[in-house]
Swiss-Prot record:
GO cellular component, one term: cytoplasm
Keywords, alphabetical: ATP-binding, Coenzyme A biosynthesis, Cytoplasm, Kinase, Nucleotide-binding, Potassium, Transferase
Principal place of residence: cytoplasm
Active site positions, chain numbering: 110
Molecular-function annotations in GO: ATP binding; pantothenate kinase activity
EC number(s) stated in the UniProt entry for this protein: 2.7.1.33
GO terms classed as biological process: coenzyme A biosynthetic process
Protein name: Type III pantothenate kinase
Record has Kinase as a keyword: yes
Record function comment: Catalyzes the phosphorylation of pantothenate (Pan), the first step in CoA biosynthesis.
Gene: coaX
Species the sequence originates in: Ehrlichia canis (strain Jake)
The reaction(s) this protein catalyses: (R)-pantothenate + ATP = (R)-4'-phosphopantothenate + ADP + H(+)
Similarity comment: family membership: Belongs to the type III pantothenate kinase family.
CDD domains reported for this sequence: ASKHA_NBD_PanK-III (cd24015)
Length: 264
């Protein structure tokens, strides 16, 4: 069994997986780094819920874009599971014949995991993969599995927090779905601005990218804010909320030469 760990700027995901199935995922906030012992407390809860044994865990793969949290995750793996974990990085793209044609190969490990999963789930397609996390990252992958371009924009939570941070009187609001656009109180007006502003930004960016690329792009959304698009008919073809974890699982199977690769 695999423990897949996705460390993002806003949340950490712990997932317990078999070779072809994600059994359980929990999310915790990542704003403040914790100790290996504290992270084990959360992970131990999942293992107990699944009624499985620690001995069944034979691999741990970590995708992390927060260096300060990577260290306790390494300690967690070694101290509690006696496993030297695999740290997902750009070198793993070669295993899947994925080429990174970006300056300085500037691609986060979470986004690479997304691309690994998307290229396996939707093969032989020109893909636009949108990671809707702390930042909103649009990555382009062609049929030849070359990552050749990207757009990076603020995430919905950054939009919400920035209004409070850079103004004297505006309150802090949450990111939440809104049925209407115009409101008569400041809280709902701000929530509407964040929600509909984010929806409009993403839809507009997709439209501009497709127009500029002049090709039929299969559009996939993933990440913590992708749920905002569940009720909207947009150019997004598929919403894959756990694409990063699936990418880590594909890597696990590839490194293990596991025949379950195509059934995730």
């Amino acid at each position: 069994m695999l423990i897949a760990i996705d460390v993002g700027n806003t949340n950490i995901k712990f997932a317990i997986c078999t070779s072809n199935r994600i059994l359980k995922i929990i999310r915790i906030a990542s704003q403040q780094a914790k100790t290996a012992d504290q992270y084990f407390f959360y992970l131990n809860n999942i293992i107990n819920q699944l009624n499985t044994d620690f001995k069944n865990i034979n691999n741990i793969i970590i995708s992390s874009v927060v260096p300060s949290i990577t260290k306790p995750m390494l300690e967690l793996s070694k101290n509690y599971f006696n496993i030297n974990p695999i740290i997902l990085d750009n070198n793993h793209a070669d295993i899947f014949n994925i080429k990174i044609n970006l300056q300085n190969k500037a691609l986060g490990s979470d986004r690479l995991a997304d691309i690994i999963a998307a290229s396996n789930i939707y093969p032989n397609k020109d893909l636009l993969i949108i990671g809707m996390g702390t930042a909103t990252v649009f990555n382009l992958l062609n049929k030849d599995k070359c990552i050749y371009g990207q757009v990076i924009a603020p995430g919905a939570h950054i939009l919400a927090k920035s209004m409070r941070q850079f103004t004297a009187l505006l309150p802090e609001v949450s990111v939440s779905k809104q049925d209407k656009v115009v409101h008569n109180n400041i809280y709902h007006a701000m929530e509407s601005g964040v929600y509909w502003g984010y929806i409009t930004m993403v839809n507009g960016m997709i439209e501009k990218i497709i127009k500029e690329e002049k090709k039929d792009l299969h559009v996939i959304a993933t990440g913590g804010n992708s749920y905002l698009f569940f009720d909207h008919k947009t150019a997004i073809n598929n919403i894959e909320t756990d694409l990063t974890i699936k990418g880590i699982l594909y890597l696990h199977n590839m490194l293990s030469n596991n025949t379950a690769q195509n059934s995730i």
